[in-house]
Every structure is written in structure tokens, then in C-alpha cells.
Curated annotation (Swiss-Prot):
Disulfide bonds join C60-C65, C68-C114, C164-C199, C277-C316. The chain crosses the membrane at residues 335-355, 367-387, 403-423, 505-524, 533-559, 564-584, 594-614, 624-644. One of its GO terms (cellular component) is plasma membrane. GO terms for biological process: intracellular monoatomic cation homeostasis; intracellular zinc ion homeostasis; zinc ion import across plasma membrane; zinc ion transmembrane transport. Residues 356-366, 424-504, 560-563, 615-623 are cytoplasmic. Residues 27-334, 388-402, 525-532, 585-593, 645-653 are extracellular. This is Zinc transporter ZIP4. It is linked to Defects in SLC39A4 are the cause of bovine hereditary zinc-deficiency (BHZD); also known as lethal trait A46, Adema disease, hereditary parakeratosis, and hereditary thymus hypoplasia. BHZD is a autosomal recessive disease caused by the inability to absorb sufficient zinc. The symptoms are diarrhea, immune system dysfunction, skin lesions and death if untreated. Oral zinc supplementation allows symptom free development of calves. Zn(2+) 1 binds at H513, D517, H542, H546. Homodimer; homodimerization is mediated by the transmembrane domain. Residues 243-253 have a biased composition (Basic and acidic residues). It is found in: Cell membrane; Recycling endosome membrane; Apical cell membrane. It comes from Bos taurus (Bovine).
């Protein structure tokens, strides 16, 4: 041990011991001492030996996992805030905890960790693991599962005679340097044992379950007394009232007719497995039983203490889910959801804002087109880049991470959509127009009175927003009378039954649509505030052109400005109903997934079936300006949702 005090010899001897693979277990004093004392460092030679040991320890089911870790990758763990800086020559003691967490990730999931290393996120994932293990309640359970994954990936299985390291030993070694329950020292102890070639036992021994039951009573008697047995049976819901025995004195609690003596709470420091919920496969593995042979009567007598311990500890009882950093409390969900929905509903008043400006008829047309393209980008981007990964479970934070690869694949879907959009738009711009196509209007539009179509209401001429002489009583006939000579006829305008029905069809369709939007916003805020923000942004972007178009369509149907605004606002308020239904129902994670899946389908339908055709069919005297606005809106919407999808884990207040 004196040689370890000399500079450079300690790491070198550790490397030689790892390469020798003698199979003997040595106490990992090197890493723990380095971490606790803050003296010394790991140089390139030591790190190279450690990485070779890690690569030799793992085994994948489909063959060798291969080597993906380099010394430079390990040295980069010391400067995660400067990924482009040149590598140093040593790893300082203050980075041992991150190195240990990063090594544990590699041992438990080598393929996934290699993907993180290539993406430059190895240090970030190691820090996330350390934060996850900070909770003392989650430390034992998470470390047990981590040891199970490491044991499953181990290249060789330990023999029955081999003494292996278990979780209590790791916790004890961390406590020995004055850091009980601290994840950094525990993982450093784990890495030290890996370096020395030790094996691991992830599950407790059979004797643990018997010891747990006897630890439940507080008396000094090594045996369970009658009173304690009665308390134990009552806790299990077994047996009837205990009759006092003749030999009992009147001072006995049972003799006085009092209830059984309550059991003492389990000592949390007695064992690291007290809160571990074991599966049937785990229990059979503890007792060395074959899954194919099953449990014999003799085996049942052996494993009964394990079942009793699981019942007494309550380890498998449903635990209240604690909100994560991204999740909101119930009051915050209602507050932020209501504010977001209110902003969305205010879109219904934008028509009045445009009508107040008599010179904005041409400008309003380009504003609508810009919002239209931004809505397509926001809707498709939110559906494909944000909602679909959540629905498919690709945005998980339970240790199994898929990296950015699915995001790039989904971005390629949007790339294909954009490529064909460019092809069609350039094809229409470069080819000569049909002489019958209108050239002097801002846009061509047709009308369908048999039903509600957003494509109809979104393709509007600038004259659709001309201000009437009397704002409080103006109608669509007043707005376009100066351009429609037939409306100047002394005969009153006769509206067809279909045109008279159109306002109610539009209002009903918008009410259902806004109700679905409210459901989507509510489910998004149930998931996290980031998902709520992204969904609210997408809904807002597509509601602006929708509400403007619907307002103009209502005016075209002959309604007054006041009545058109009233119907527009009334249909928008159904979004609050959908929001509160989603929040009050308190759907679980599965329910949120289904609602978000339906919301993704709704967004794709509205974007690709309603709004994109409106963009493709619009005609204008300045087509290249429209082409520029459409591209800016599309790319802007996709960029915002892409950045949110990639970096939402790094957003915090």
C-alpha cells in the first residue's frame, strides 16, 4: 500500500491488476480516496486501463458490444461546459463522481451510451444520473436496478463460491469516507470494484427476508413474543381476537383488552433492500429456483419469508407519483392553461382589429398568408417533432434514452414535405398562368355553402376586410358594394338557404374544433409545462388565420359585424370547456398519451388538408412575395419546434 502513495505508481498498479484479471476482489481505496481527499489525479495511462476494463466487462446479446470509449472522451468529462476545448492530460478528483456515473451508464447500456458519446451528451447523461440518485428514497431502488443491468451485461457469471459485492457493501464503503447515501462516492466504489475485477450481487440473500421480519419488533428478546405475533397477524389482516391465557397477568396489554402491540417501523438504515419491490422472477432468482421447473412445495416453504417481507415493507404498494421538475401542480395547470387558452381565444377579436384600419386591406392579406404558413409549420412540427416522440415513448428519462436519432428521422419527414412543396410552388410560379386565372385580385377564392371549409375561408380577397361605413351595423354587402355593382341594385340581396345556413355550420364546426384544441392544451399541460408551451404555440399559430378567415366568411354570409364577432367569440370559448374537461378528468399517463396522439392527428389534418391547400391555391399580383412569406413561415415554425424538441431538457427556470 505504500507504493500507492508514490506519484504515478498507484494508477499503474491498478491498470496492471485489471489487465491481469485474476478474479480476486480488492478494496477500491484508490478512487474513493482520490474522491474524498481531493489529492492526485487520473492520467491518460490510468484512464486507458480503466476503459479497457470497462470494454472487457460488457457483453451484448447479439455479440460483442465493441469499443466506443476513448481516453479523450473520458477526459472530456472534466469539461462538459466546454465541449470544443482541447483535452487535458489528467482527470481531477472533483470529476471522479461524473466519471463513475458515466461508467455505470456504459456498463448498464453500452449501445445507448455509445450513441450518447457520439452525440456529445455523455457528461450530461452522467449528471442526470447523479441528480436522479440524489433522493435517498430512490437511491437504493435505482442502484439495485442498475446493478441488475450491469450483472445482465457482464461477460462472465460469478460462481456460487465467489464472494461478490452487493449494494449494502457499496453504501457502507461510501459511509466509511463520511458520505453516507451520496451517489458520487457510491458509484465511485462501484467503479473501483469493476476496475479490480469483482463480481456483483444485485439481489439480497434468502436470510435477509427472515431478518427483516424479526427486525419489526422493538423488544430485546431474540424471539417474537405472543403480543408481537398478534400485531404481525393484525398487520397482515390475519387471525381473530387473541384470548388471554391463564398464565397472563392482568398487567399484560392483552389481558387488559387492549389491542396488540404495534410493530416498530422498519429501520431504514438496517438494509438497503427494505423498499425494493421484487418481481416473481427476482424472488425465484434469490432462492436459485428454475423458472422452467417452477416452485415445489419445499421451495414454497423457503420463499414464504420473501412474500411476507414484501407485504410488511409495503415496497410494492402504489406510491404517490411526485411531480418532476417539468410537471406543474394542479393550481399551476389551471392557471397556465387558462392563460394560454385566453390568448388563443383573443384571436377571435383580430378581425375587428383589421376592420378598424381602412388602409390595411392589402396588408391584412399578407399577414394572413404569413400566419397561415407559420401555422402549417407549427402544426406539423409539433405533431411530428414533439407530440409523436412523446406518444411513442421516445422522450423518456428513466435511463433508457434514444438520443436525437428519432428526431432527425422525423425531421426527414418534414424535409420530404418541404421538398415537394417547393417543387409544386416553383412549378406554378415558373410556368405561364392560365389566361382565365385572376391576375388582379390578391387571391382567388371560391365558396362552398354546403359545409364549412377552412380552405374557403382562408383564401380571401383584400376586399373581404374593407371597413364598413357603420361598424356597428355594417354587413358583408356593405363591405364589397363598391366592388360589386350587382349589390347596388335597389332590390334587397336574396340569400340562398345554403348561404343562410353557412354561419351556423361555421360556428358549430369551430366550436367542435376549439373544444378539441382545449383538450389538447389541457393534456399537454398535464404532461409538462414544456409540452403545454409547444402545443399552445401551435394552436395559437393556426387559430390566427382560422379566426380571421372564419370572421370574413361570416361577413360574406351576410351577418353584421357585431353578430359575426359574437359567433366567433362564442365558438372560441368552447376551448375553455375542453381545457377544464382535460384538467378535471386528471387522466393518467396512458390517457395523456392517447389524447396527445389524437391531437397530433388533428394537427396534421388541419395543416395538410385545410391550410396547405390554401397556400398552394392562392393567387397574387406579387407571387414571389407570397412565396417568400410562405417559406419564412414554414421554416420558422419548424425551427422553433425543432429547437424545443432538441433542447427542452435543458430549459429550466
Amino acid at each position: 500500500m505504500a507504493l500507492l502513495g508514490r506519484p504515478g505508481l498507484g494508477p499503474l498498479l491498478a491498470v496492471l491488476a485489471a489487465l491481469a484479471a485474476s478474479g480476486t476482489t480488492t478494496r477500491p481505496v484508490h478512487l474513493l480516496t482520490l474522491l474524498s481527499s481531493g489529492q492526485g489525479a487520473l492520467d491518460r495511462v490510468a484512464l486507458g486501463g480503466l476503459l479497457n476494463t470497462l470494454a472487457a466487462r460488457v457483453h451484448c446479446a447479439d455479440g460483442p458490444c465493441g469499443k466506443c470509449l476513448s481516453v479523450d472522451d473520458a477526459l472530456a468529462l472534466g469539461r462538459p461546459e466546454q465541449p470544443g476545448a482541447p483535452s487535458g492530460q489528467v482527470l481531477e478528483p472533483r470529476h471522479i463522481a461524473r466519471l463513475s456515473a458515466a461508467a455505470a451508464l456504459y456498463l448498464s447500456d453500452p449501445a445507448g451510451t455509445c450513441a450518447e458519446v457520439r452525440a456529445g451528451r455523455w457528461a450530461a447523461r452522467a449528471d442526470q444520473l447523479l441528480v436522479l440518485l440524489e433522493s435517498s428514497q430512490a437511491l437504493s431502488v435505482a442502484l439495485t436496478r442498475l446493478l441488475q443491468q450491469i450483472q445482465a451485461r457482464a461477460a462472465g457469471q460469478p460462481t456460487s463460491q465467489q464472494a461478490c459485492v452487493d449494494l449494502p457493501q457499496l453504501l457502507g464503503e461510501a459511509a466509511g469516507i463520511g458520505a453516507p447515501g451520496s451517489p458520487g462516492p457510491v458509484l465511485a466504489a462501484l467503479l473501483g470494484h469493476v476496475w479490480s475485477g469483482a463480481c456483483f450481487h444485485a439481489l439480497p440473500t434468502p436470510q435477509y427476508f427472515v431478518d427483516f421480519v424479526f427486525r419489526q419488533h422493538s423488544s430485546e428478546n431474540p424471539n417474537i413474543t405472543l403480543d408481537e405475533l398478534a400485531a404481525l397477524m393484525e398487520r397482515l389482516g390475519l387471525g381473530g381476537a387473541t384470548e388471554p391465557h391463564d398464565s397472563h397477568s392482568d398487567d399484560s396489554p392483552l389481558g387488559k383488552g387492549q389491542g396488540p402491540v404495534p410493530l416498530a417501523a422498519p429501520n431504514s438504515s438496517a438494509s438497503a433492500w427494505d423498499t425494493l419491490c421484487l418481481s416473481a422472477q427476482d424472488i425465484m432468482a434469490v432462492y436459485g429456483m428454475s423458472e422452467q421447473a417452477g416452485v415445489t412445495p419445499d421451495d414454497w416453504a423457503r420463499l414464504s419469508p420473501a412474500l411476507l417481507q414484501q407485504q410488511l415493507s409495503g415496497a410494492c404498494s402504489p406510491q404517490p407519483t411526485l411531480p418532476t421538475q417539468d410537471q406543474l401542480s394542479q393550481a399551476e395547470r389551471y392557471l397556465y392553461g387558462s392563460l394560454a387558452t385566453l390568448l388563443i381565444c383573443l384571436c377571435s377579436l383580430l378581425g375587428l382589429l383589421l376592420l378598424s384600419c381602412a388602409s390595411c386591406s392589402t396588408t391584412s392579406h399578407y399577414i394572413i398568408q404569413a400566419f397561415l404558413s407559420m401555422a402549417v409549420g407549427a402544426l406539423t412540427g409539433d405533431a411530428l417533432l414533439h407530440l409523436m416522440p412523446k406518444v411513442l415513448g421516445l422522450h423518456t428519462h428513466d435511463g433508457e434514452d434514444h438520443g436525437f436519432q428519432p428526431t432527425w428521422h422525423l425531421l426527414a419527414v418534414l424535409g420530404g414535405l418541404y421538398a415537394f412543396f417547393l417543387f409544386e410552388r416553383l412549378f406554378n410560379l415558373l410556368l405561364p398562368l392560365d389566361p382565365e386565372d385572376p391576375k388582379d385580385g390578391a387571391c382567388s377564392h371560391g365558396h362552398s355553402h354546403g359545409g364549412h371549409s377552412h380552405g374557403v375561408s382562408l383564401q380571401l380577397a383584400p376586399s373581404d376586410f374593407r371597413q364598413p361605413k357603420q361598424l356597428h351595423e355594417g354587413s358583408r354587402a356593405d363591405l364589397v358594394a363598391e366592388e360589386s355593382p350587382e349589390l347596388l341594385s335597389p332590390e334587397p340581396r336574396r340569400r340562398s338557404p345554403g348561404l343562410r345556413l353557412l354561419p351556423y355550420v361555421i360556428t358549430l364546426g369551430d366550436a367542435v374544433h376549439n373544444f378539441a384544441d382545449g383538450l389538447a392544451v389541457g393534456a399537454a399541460f398535464l404532461s409538462s409545462w414544456k409540452t403545454g408551451l409547444a402545443t399552445s404555440l401551435a394552436v395559437f399559430c393556426h387559430e390566427v388565420p382560422h379566426e380571421l378567415g372564419d370572421f370574413a366568411a361570416l361577413l360574406h354570409a351576410g351577418l353584421s359585424v357585431r353578430r359575426a364577432l359574437l359567433l366567433n367569440v362564442a365558438s372560441a370559448l368552447t376551448a375553455f370547456i375542453g381545457l377544464y374537461v382535460a384538467l378535471a378528468a386528471g387522466v393518467g399517463e396512458d390517457g395523456e398519451t392517447w389524447i396527445l396522439a389524437v391531437a397530433a392527428g388533428l394537427f396534421l389534418y388541419v395543416a395538410l388538408c385545410d391550410m396547405l391547400p390554401a397556400m398552394l391555391n392562392v393567387r397574387d399580383r406579387r407571387p414571389w412575395l407570397l412565396f417568400l412569406l410562405h417559406n419564412v413561415g414554414l421554416l420558422g415554425g419548424w425551427t422553433v419546434l425543432l429547437l424545443l424538441s432538441l433542447y427542452e431538457d435543458n430549459i429550466a427556470f
